[in-house]
Amino acid sequence: MTKMAELKGSSFTLSALHLVDGDIKKATDYLKEKVNQAPNFFASAPVVIDITQAGREINFKQLKEDVKDAGMIPVGVSGCKDARMQNEAKSAGFAIMNAARQAKDMPVTVEPTRIIRTPVRSGQQIYAKNCDLVVMNHVSAGAEIIADGCIHVYGNLRGRAIAGASGQHQAQIFCQNIQSELISIAGNYWLSDKIKAEFWGKGVVISLAENNLNIEHLTL
C-alpha cells in the first residue's frame, strides 16, 4: 500500500525575537529594521517569540499581527510557563514551544571539501553539504554561501556566509576581506552592522563560543 504521508521528527534553526519588557511596538520596530537590512535572509522567515522576560500581560493577537507586518512569520512562543498565557497564545494561533536541551554536536558523514573557483554572483546560492566550502574568488552582495562545516573565502566576501548550517558549533569562517551582509555559525548570526570597523575589509576568522560569535584578525 502506498504511504499517504509520513510524520517524522526533525530539527530546524529558527530565529528568536526576545520580548524584553513587553513593549510589542518597540520589539517589532526592531524586527522590521532587521528585515529591511537583510530581506533575503529574514523576509517571510519563521520566527519564535521568547516572552521569558516580557511580564504577564501580553496582547498575543497584536503581537502576531505586528510581527507579520514587520515581514516575518510568527510560528510560536517560548518561555511561556503560565497556563493562562499559554491558552491566550494558543487562541491567537501560536504554538507553545519549549527550549530544547543543549544538544551535542551530531556526527555527520564527512565529504570532501567543496571548492568553488569562479565568482559567486548576486542571486546565487552555494551549499556544501556535510563538508567545508572553499571559495577561491569573490562572493558578491546578494549571494549566499552555506556549509555544514567551515567556510574559507579567498576573495571579498560581500554576500551572506552561513557555516555550521546543520548545527556544528566548531565550524568557523575564514575570510580575506570581510564586507558581509550576514555571517552565521550554527544559527547564531551577525548582520553587517555588528562587524566592527576595525575588522571591516580585513582578513578575519569568525568562530563560536557559548553561542556568541567571536571575530579576530586573520594572522599567521
From Swiss-Prot:
Pfam hit, one: MinC_N
UniProt KW Disulfide bond keyword: no
InterPro entries according to UniProt: CAP/MinC_C, MinC, MinC_C_sf, MinC_N, Septum_form_inhib_MinC_C
Keyword flag Cell cycle: yes
GO biological process, alphabetically ordered: cell morphogenesis; division septum assembly; regulation of cell division; regulation of cell septum assembly
Gene3D superfamilies the UniProt entry points to: 2.160.20.70, 3.30.70.260
Keywords: Cell cycle, Cell division, Septation
Domain of life: Bacteria
Function noted in UniProt: Cell division inhibitor that blocks the formation of polar Z ring septums. Rapidly oscillates between the poles of the cell to destabilize FtsZ filaments that have formed before they mature into polar Z rings. Prevents FtsZ polymerization.
Membership in a protein family: Belongs to the MinC family.
Assembly behavior: Interacts with MinD and FtsZ.
PANTHER family: SEPTUM SITE-DETERMINING PROTEIN MINC
Protein name: Probable septum site-determining protein MinC
Annotated organism of origin: Photobacterium profundum (strain SS9)
Lineage per the UniProt record: Bacteria, Pseudomonadati, Pseudomonadota, Gammaproteobacteria, Vibrionales
